[in-house]
């Protein structure tokens, strides 16, 4: 199955996040033992909200720069960005219900 989750890198951040008209849910997380589970959750969210929300995952070598730019102090952090501006944030492991709640407030 084709993924609906975009890989966000420094080279495509402008196109994938800033220029995107829809809100973008970004997962900022290292590739640890919890990573596969969180990717499954954002895949479900990406399918569920495919027309109204873009979902992105940070490339590993872009995480530190992103954390600095968006004042992310812990991971995993889920951010909702609209034209690059933060509109929502959640720190910690998330399930589908928690992310749905975060999205509903944007």
Predicted regions and their residues:
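N-terminal leader/targeting and pre-domain segments
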Residues: 1-24, 101-106
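Hydrophobic beta-strand anchors of alpha/beta hydrolase catalytic cores
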Residues: 24-26, 55, 78
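Non-catalytic, surface beta->alpha helical segment in thiol-disulfide oxidoreductase systems
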Residues: 79-106
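Thiol-based oxidoreductase modules, predominantly thioredoxin-like and allied folds used
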Residues: 6-9, 28-30, 43-65
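Short, glycine/charged-enriched secondary-structure capping and boundary segments
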Residues: 39-42, 70-73, 93-95
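Short alpha-helical
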Residues: 33, 37, 62, 97
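Local sequence-structure signature of Cys/Sec-based thiol-disulfide redox active-site neighborhoods
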Residues: 12-47
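Structural micro-motif
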Residues: 22, 70-82, 97
């Amino acid at each position: 199955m084709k993924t609906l989750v975009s890989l966000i890198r420094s080279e495509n951040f402008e196109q994938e996040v800033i220029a995107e008209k829809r809100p973008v849910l970004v997962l900022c997380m290292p590739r640890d033992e919890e990573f596969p589970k969180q990717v499954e959750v954002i895949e479900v969210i990406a399918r569920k909200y495919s027309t109204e929300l873009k979902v992105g995952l940070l490339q590993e070598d872009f995480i530190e720069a992103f954390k600095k730019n968006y004042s992310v102090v812990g991971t995993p952090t889920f951010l909702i960005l609209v034209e690059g501006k933060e509109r929502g944030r959640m720190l910690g492991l998330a399930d589908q219900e928690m992310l749905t709640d975060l999205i509903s407030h944007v």
